[in-house]
Amino acid sequence: MEWTRGRILGRGSTATVYAAAGHNSDEILAVKSSEVHRSEFLQREAKILSSLSSPYVIGYRGSETKRESNGVVMYNLLMEYAPYGTLTDAAAKDGGRVDETRVVKYTRDILKGLEYIHSKGIVHCDVKGSNVVISEKGEAKIADFGCAKRVDPVFESPVMGTPAFMAPEVARGEKQGKESDIWAVGCTMIEMVTGSPPWTKADSREDPVSVLYRVGYSSETPELPCLLAEEAKDFLEKCLKREANERWTATQLLNHPFLTTKPDIEPVLVPGLISNSPTSVTDQTFWRSVEEEEEEETEEIQKDSRDLDRLSLWGCYSERIGRLKCVGGLDGTRCDMEGGDWIMVRARCEGTMISGSQKELIISENVLVGEL
């Protein structure tokens, strides 16, 4: 498959996401690229994504290794392009919150996606609003499998993800299974309803070390939004049991009255063309340092991100958080978007149909032609 690379959609510490256009079709693609020597996580993501096919999981379109004109060898992962952005984008567009009808719709879609990937023996490990995208047909699709792994009853790989969405057993470094994804669904629903992840407030920046400790070692569960109906609160309680074996499965939750008594609706997709948002769909590496003096240390940590598999999560909390920055940004803050230190890490093209002129705009700034 030949394709033309276009403008940047997102950028992380080890990979960059571009819009791209196939030469033999009108399809717009998202291409995630990384230098081969830094592409361990990306190659693992491609391997997992290539084994999945569901209306509720971002579509895999291929992968390749290619030497660029500057001599650098790149690994490219080709994926379905989601023109309506992420759940986080959707909430921001509506004043920071998603209305109840769409909360039901998107939660149902996420659970259908998880039911499918769990049936394949895969755990996502980083479910959150910025890792769920809205397709051109309005479905919520699970994306960004950079932290995903296959369930292995013998070998426990290091835990990954975003602290504010981690289940207690994950925050303690014990295990990360299907039950952990269910906890994250509850956290994502809270994010949709309130505009902020649990454990945080929209107008404050809580130390991620404190968040991780509260999640793992307190007896607390995330505060349930008071505006929710009792049915919705009961649904969240089934997701947010501190004991993993007490949480409902994706299949059980799909049969909860909160989801079954509400009609399946066609979401209203707001028309437009391009809008930018400081969130990442396909890379969990966007992270603002907790303190300015940590920036130099963070750069060194990012260079060592490939050594994450050797990290003992029973080590110092500060070290654990530093390493997690490389694979899972904490989206628990709403930073000043007018500041000069933001970079554009997500672009949306809205509208269910892509015209020729729109396609040219999306993939403008072409830099090379790839061949798959």
Swiss-Prot record:
Source species, domain of life: Eukaryota
Sites bearing Phosphoserine, chain numbering: 312
Gene Ontology CC entries for this record: nucleus
UniProtKB keywords: Abscisic acid signaling pathway, ATP-binding, Kinase, Nucleotide-binding, Nucleus, Phosphoprotein, Serine/threonine-protein kinase, Transferase
GO MF terms held by the record: ATP binding; MAP kinase kinase kinase activity; protein kinase binding; protein serine kinase activity; protein serine/threonine kinase activity
Family, similarity comment: Belongs to the protein kinase superfamily. Ser/Thr protein kinase family.
Protein's UniProt name: Mitogen-activated protein kinase kinase kinase 17
